[in-house]
Amino acid sequence: MSAGAIDEKNICQRVGLFVLAIVMLTFPLRNVQAQTDCGEGGTLDMTPPKEMTTDVLIQKFLAQETKVQAARLHYQYTQDVLVQTLDGKTVDGQFHQVTEVSYDDRGKRADKVTFSEQPTLRGIQMSSEDFDDIREFMPWVLTTEQAAQYNLTYAGQQHVDDLDTYVFHVVPKTEEKNKRYFEGRVWVDSRDLQVVKLCGKSVPETVRKKKNEPLDVRPTFVGYRQIIDGNWFPVYARVDDTLQFGTASVHVREIVKFNGYKRADGSQVAPKP
């Protein structure tokens, strides 16, 4: 911001608490108090994976993520963005936009804005990088092709709601000019070997080249997924961060929901997150 087939019954039993946690997180922003912390959660067990080496684990979950990315291109969904600035505990401005998202036969994304209110954000304005975060990084899927640009380091195992997960640190190998990357952590479900949670930010932050050019500071976000037709699709992301602009700071909260997934051919409507 500037200035394979899965048994549905088992799915329901297995992800019930995880989905409940997502639903609880989607209450109005005034009820969200803790700032985003990628280190929060249960005890991190640094024991190596038992059934395979770390390298094999990485290869397998990247292959699954590649399938998720390909599958998601065959769905339409709604992207609902709410950004708020706060003065103490009081909301003093917001930006709200709802967009219908679809993809053509070549995987090219098409956006149709169905609701957009006049922004009243205080102390900040939405930048192109903010919209990149919403479109690309909050619902980020780490495919085999993308992984060539990153160093993935095994961090351990952690219980997330009712799921057992493997945790990886993800850092770009290099930062090429005019390109943006994800930096943070991903949580990989130990059974399905797909990402179920991620936390981090997009990098690099834009360097101010001119004296009067506004600073662009990237907030830390956390994103969650839910099983949609057998794949873990992005459904929710949030930001609760205090952004520092020189000597000034702005408290920002953000909720992004990706919901109403349905197949593009209309043959089957997926359950809403």
Regions found by a protein language model. Give the residues of each.
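Non-globular disordered terminal and juxtamembrane segments underlying protein topogenesis/assembly
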Residues: 186-188
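Bacterial N-terminal signal peptides
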Residues: 16-28
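Extended interaction regions within the primary functional domain
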Residues: 7, 24, 35
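Structured extracytoplasmic
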Residues: 35-182, 191-196, 201-219, 226-235, ...
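Sec/Tat signal peptide C-region and signal peptidase I cleavage site
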Residues: 30-34
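N-terminal secretory signal peptides that target proteins for export/translocation
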Residues: 1-13
